[in-house]
């Protein structure tokens, strides 16, 4: 909607929409770097990445911080944390539809050598065959430590969006 509005108001603009989870993956990289090195990154924007793929199925084929290649640090971390994943201090995958432990992301990195840059629940949607090992049944999803968007959440979200639209139109 935002990009569509930009083109409507300013047709000459060169813009594209990108899932915000790319930025979330930069924050995960920051956390892993800090945990592994003990050095603090003041701003996750200082992590430079090259993004490839399509919306909700995006990948980093390059990631660096101050000229330091983050792939070896990420590789080491994914090997050491393939079972428990990465947990951001204030978030827990078990309490939220939209959180995850990034274990699918780690698994895909070990398989393909690129950093998956979307949430685990989006990544598995694009992985028929391979994805079956992630989505086989509720116990499998739980083992991979990511949440699925529930029908109840979708219904509630729709009602909230419709109410907001009505308020804005009034």
What residues fall within each predicted segment?
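Class I S-adenosyl-L-methionine
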Residues: 4-7, 30, 34
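Long, compositionally biased stretches enriched for glycine and/or charged residues
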Residues: 34-170
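Catalytic or ion-translocation cores adjacent to nucleophile or general acid/base/metal-coordination motifs
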Residues: 11-32
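Rossmann-fold NAD(P)-binding glycine/threonine-rich loop
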Residues: 1-13
């Amino acid at each position: 909607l935002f990009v569509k509005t930009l083109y409507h108001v300013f047709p000459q603009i060169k813009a594209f929409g990108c899932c915000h989870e790319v930025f979330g993956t930069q924050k995960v990289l920051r956390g892993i770097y800090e945990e592994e090195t003990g050095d603090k990154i003041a701003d996750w924007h200082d992590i430079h990445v090259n993004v490839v793929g399509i919306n909700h199925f995006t990948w980093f084929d390059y990631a660096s911080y101050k000229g330091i290649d983050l792939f070896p640090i990420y590789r080491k971390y994914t090997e050491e944390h393939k079972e428990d994943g990465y947990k951001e201090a204030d978030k827990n995958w078990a309490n939220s539809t939209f959180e995850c432990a990034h274990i699918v992301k780690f698994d895909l990195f070990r398989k393909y050598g690129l950093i998956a840059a979307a949430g685990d629940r989006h990544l598995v949607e694009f992985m028929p065959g391979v994805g079956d090992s992630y989505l086989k049944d509720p116990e499998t999803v739980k083992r991979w430590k990511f949440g699925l968007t529930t029908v109840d959440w979708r219904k509630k979200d729709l009602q909230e969006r419709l109410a907001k639209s009505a308020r804005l139109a009034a």
